[in-house]
Amino acid sequence: MIRLMGIDPGLRFMGWGIIDVDGNHLKHVASGVIGTDGSESVPLRLCELHGALKKLIREYAPAEAAVEETYVNRNGSSTLKLGYARGVALLTPAYEGLPVAEYGAMTVKKSVVGTGSASKEQVTMMVKRLLPGAEIRKADASDALAVAICHAHHRASAAHVVAGKRMA
C-alpha cells in the first residue's frame, strides 16, 4: 500500500486530498481546502499555504505528491498569482522529501472520467464513485483527489516525477 497526496493549486483556495492505494483499490483518507484571506499580502498568503501543506504532509505522511499544472488565462495578474501558489504546492512536498509529479488538467480528467473535456461536475461524480464514502464539500478538494487518483494510475512513469529532497 502507498499513500498519495494530490494538490490543486490556488492562492485563494488550495485543494488537497490524501488517498491510499493498494493495487487497484483506492481509499479516501482525507481531503479539504486551505483558504487564505484575500485582504492579506501575497507573501503572507503564500506562507499560510506553505505552513498548512507542511502540517498536512507531516500529519498524513504521504509517500508521494502530485500537483495539477496551471493554465494561462487572459488576466496576467491572476495567472502570476496562481503560479506563486503552484510554486508553494511544488516546493512544500519536495522540501519534505516527497517525490512530486505534475499532471495537466486534461490528463487528470482523462484518467478519472475517461475524457479530457469532462466538466467539474463529472470529475466530482467520478471521484465520489472511485472513493466511496468520501464526503467532498468543495470542488477544489474534489480536483485534488482527482490529481491523486491520476497519479495512482500514472505513477510508474518516471518522466512525471521530480525527486524531492528533505531539507529540514
UniProtKB/Swiss-Prot annotation:
One of its GO terms (cellular component) is Holliday junction resolvase complex. The active site is at 8, 68, 140. InterPro entries: RNaseH-like_sf, RNaseH_sf, X-over_junc_endoDNase_Mg_BS, X-over_junc_endoDNase_RuvC. It is found in: Cytoplasm. Its cofactor is Mg(2+). It is an enzyme of class 3 (hydrolase). Keywords: Cytoplasm, DNA damage, DNA recombination, DNA repair, DNA-binding, Endonuclease, Hydrolase, Magnesium, Metal-binding, Nuclease. It holds the Pfam family RuvC. Mg(2+) 2 binds at residue 68. GO terms for molecular function: crossover junction DNA endonuclease activity; DNA binding; magnesium ion binding. Its EC number is 3.1.21.10. It catalyses: Endonucleolytic cleavage at a junction such as a reciprocal single-stranded crossover between two homologous DNA duplexes (Holliday junction). CDD domains: RuvC. Binds 2 Mg(2+) ion per subunit. One of its GO terms (biological process) is DNA repair. Mg(2+) 1 binds at residues 8, 140. Belongs to the RuvC family. Homodimer which binds Holliday junction (HJ) DNA. The HJ becomes 2-fold symmetrical on binding to RuvC with unstacked arms; it has a different conformation from HJ DNA in complex with RuvA. In the full resolvosome a probable DNA-RuvA(4)-RuvB(12)-RuvC(2) complex forms which resolves the HJ. NCBIfam families: ruvC. The RuvA-RuvB-RuvC complex processes Holliday junction (HJ) DNA during genetic recombination and DNA repair. Endonuclease that resolves HJ intermediates. Cleaves cruciform DNA by making single-stranded nicks across the HJ at symmetrical positions within the homologous arms, yielding a 5'-phosphate and a 3'-hydroxyl group; requires a central core of homology in the junction. The consensus cleavage sequence is 5'-(A/T)TT(C/G)-3'. Cleavage occurs on the 3'-side of the TT dinucleotide at the point of strand exchange. PANTHER family: CROSSOVER JUNCTION ENDODEOXYRIBONUCLEASE RUVC. This is Crossover junction endodeoxyribonuclease RuvC. It comes from Gluconobacter oxydans (strain 621H) (Gluconobacter suboxydans). The gene is ruvC.
